[in-house]
Amino acid sequence: MTDARPRICILGGGFGGLYTALRLGQLSWEGHTPPEIVLVDQRDRFLFAPFLYELVTEEMQTWEIAPPFVELLAESGVIFRQAEVTAIDFDHQKVLLNDQDKGTESLAFDQLVIALGGQTPLPNLPGLKDYGLGFRTLEDAYKLKQKLKSLEQADAEKIRIAIVGGGYSGVELAAKLGDRLGERGRIRIIERGKEILAMSPEFNRQQAQASLSAKGIWVDTETTVTAITATDVTLQFREQEDVIPVDLVLWTVGTTVSPLIRNLALPHNDQGQLRTNAQLQVEGKTNIFALGDGAEGRDASGQLIPTTAQGAFQQTDYCAWNIWANLTGRPLLPCRYQPLGEMLALGTDGAVLSGLGIKLSGPAALLARRLVYLYRFPTWQHQLTVGLNWLTRPLGDWLKNEPS
């Protein structure tokens, strides 16, 4: 930039981007020119993704899990730009944006953070794009709620749902839908591997399997989907093929890197993720950092940092510090990742968690999960507002239902 004030440009308002921006706003720039910190995201709201399931069951409301960026950043000194990132010009250190109001423009940077996240892979499967529904964004949750409402209002005896993918998202979503639909639901998880939650601790996997069984949710392992229509899915188990009638297909199969990240003129791994060093700098670029789903991050010990919310949480402190160090002439710190365990929601009245020597399931785990995530909300103001709402909502519901 020609301006004496350096600019830090953060692309992506997910966990990695937003929390890095907030942390940068908290650091002291005494004795140095304070930078301009700009956060860019194409949506107007941050999404606390672990609670997206609670939106479907109406345990939580949109404002709780998806507060507007302008509210979260109001007292941080961080500037928010709602725009789509279309390209990055590394030679001239500019980000090209498509702004709904301003059209195409560029944004110069001195320090850059690439935290654009990932997307659900959509293979060339017959019927998937027309009849499959993803579950990653706020818009996906709204579409699912609308579809469920339509199915619930119809006079069909059963509501048949196929969930493709037996990872965290598929299992948590199945359990929540099982509780919402009750006896009327006919839910099936389709997993091509030998078991669901293949990366989970054994305790979590066993508790999840027991919960799904108790809710009457079927699990088909070593099974692939070969076609989807408006009324059925075709499944292949070894050499056998079956056609199963369905009302709704939910696609929750993994994460892939966005085409924008994949096409950047930067070092990538075989999955298209940006290669970074332990300081979270993109290889060969001292002023460009990457974290989250779009980056292959390794900590000081060489341990691969998982592309989860927990991994992003821990990366953001180091990312913010190292940008600050770049601009103030301090030494950069290598990231140190500490696995803290795993939590899964298993319906509206239970969960499971394990980590740091603790194993917990049922309502106690559900409460612990909520409190841990409440603590992880972006700002203390949002923590306070949501926490008070959780405390007072039961009283409000009771008063609403109390006979006059």
UniProtKB/Swiss-Prot annotation:
- Keywords of the record: FAD, Flavoprotein, NADP, Oxidoreductase
Q: Which Pfam families match?
A: Pyr_redox_2
Residue ranges of coiled coil = none
Annotated NADP(+) binding sites:
159-195
Output the lineage of the source organism. Bacteria, Bacillati, Cyanobacteriota, Cyanophyceae, Synechococcales
Q: Which cofactors must be present for this protein to function? A: FAD
Q: What is this protein called?
A: Demethylphylloquinone reductase NdbB
Free-text function comment from the UniProt entry: Bifunctional oxidoreductase probably ables to act both on prenyl naphthoquinones and on prenyl benzoquinones. Catalyzes the penultimate step in the biosynthesis of vitamin K1.
Q: What is its EC number?
A: 1.6.5.12
| Name of the gene encoding the protein in the UniProt record | ndbB
Q: How is the cofactor bound?
A: Binds 1 FAD per subunit.
Q: Give GO terms: molecular function aspect only.
A: NAD(P)H dehydrogenase (quinone) activity
Please give the family membership noted in the entry: Belongs to the NADH dehydrogenase family.
Looking up SUPFAM superfamilies in the UniProt record yields: FAD/NAD(P)-binding domain (SSF51905)
Q: Which GO terms describe its biological process?
A: aerobic electron transport chain; phylloquinone biosynthetic process
Q: In which pathway does it act?
A: Cofactor biosynthesis; phylloquinone biosynthesis
Q: What happens when the gene is disrupted?
A: Increased photosensitivity to high light.
State the reactions this protein catalyses. demethylphylloquinone + NADPH + H(+) = demethylphylloquinol + NADP(+)
